[in-house]
Regions:
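Outer-membrane beta-barrel "beta-signal"
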Residues: 52-54, 180-193
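Sequence/structural signature of outer-membrane beta-barrel proteins
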Residues: 38-44, 63, 84-92, 126-133, ...
Length: 193
C-alpha cells in the first residue's frame, strides 16, 4: 500500500509541477550542481557505507521560486544519483557489496545569502543493492532521506558543505521479508552555482 501511495504522490507532483510550469511559460533551469562523498553506518548491524553523491539542483516553477526567494530561501528540486561500497564485516557472514541509487523526488532548501548558510534536504529515491546477507526481500529498495548541514562560500559561486543525513531503506512491502535498514550518514562536498 505504501508503494502505491508513493507512486501516486510522485505522479501527482510531476503532473502538477509540469502543468504549473507550462502555465507560467517557464522552463526548468539548473541553478547549482555539486558532488559529495562520505560514509554512514547502520547503528544496529554495524553495516558501513562509503558513497559518492553527484547532484544537480533545478529551479522550481516560477511562482514557487519567487515565493521562496522573497523569504531568503533558495528552493531546489534535486536529482541525486549515487554509488556506494557496502561493508558488513561485523556479522557472522562477512560481506562486501554495493549500492546504485537515484533520489528523484528530493528538495533542497538553503537559507540566507551569508558566507555560512544552513540547509535542509529531504526526499525519496530508489536503490539497487546486492547486500544479500540481510534478507531484504528484493534487490530493489526504496529510500526515504532527511538531512541538514552548513555550507561555507569559499568564493562566489563555489561552496564547501558538511552535512548529516538519516536514511531508511526498505522494499516497501514488495516481498514478504521487509526488515528495512536505517543509516546515519556524514557527507562533505562542493557546490557550484
Amino acid at each position: 500500500m505504501r508503494f502505491a501511495r508513493s507512486i501516486l504522490l510522485a505522479m501527482f507532483a510531476i503532473v502538477t509541477s509540469a502543468t504549473l510550469a507550462r502555465a507560467e511559460g517557464s522552463c526548468i533551469e539548473m541553478r547549482e550542481w555539486g558532488v559529495r562523498a562520505g560514509g554512514g553506518i547502520n547503528p544496529s548491524s554495524q553495516i558501513q557505507y562509503y558513497a559518492i553523491h553527484p547532484y544537480v539542483g533545478l529551479s522550481l516553477w516560477k511562482s514557487a521560486s519567487r515565493w521562496s526567494d522573497q523569504y531568503g530561501i533558495r528552493a531546489l528540486w534535486m536529482i541525486e544519483p549515487w554509488v556506494a561500497y557496502v561493508n558488513d564485516d561485523h556479522g557472522p557472514q562477512k560481506t562486501d557489496s554495493f549500492e546504485i541509487g537515484l533520489n528523484l523526488l528530493f528538495i533542497r532548501l538553503v537559507f540566507g545569502d551569508w558566507v555560512v548558510r544552513p540547509f535542509v534536504e529531504a526526499g525519496e529515491g530508489a536503490v539497487y543493492t546486492d547486500l544479500r546477507k540481510q534478507d531484504l526481500g528484493t534487490r530493489l529498495q526504496f529510500t526515504s532521506t532527511i538531512g541538514g548541514g552548513l555550507e561555507y562560500e569559499i568564493q562566489p559561486g563555489m561552496s564547501v558543505g558538511l552535512q548529516a543525513r538519516f536514511r531508511h531503506m526498505s522494499n516497501a512491502g514488495m516481498a514478504s521479508s521487509n526488515p528495512g535498514i536505517n543509516t546515519v550518514f556524514g557527507l562533505v562536498g562542493l557546490t557550484f552555482r
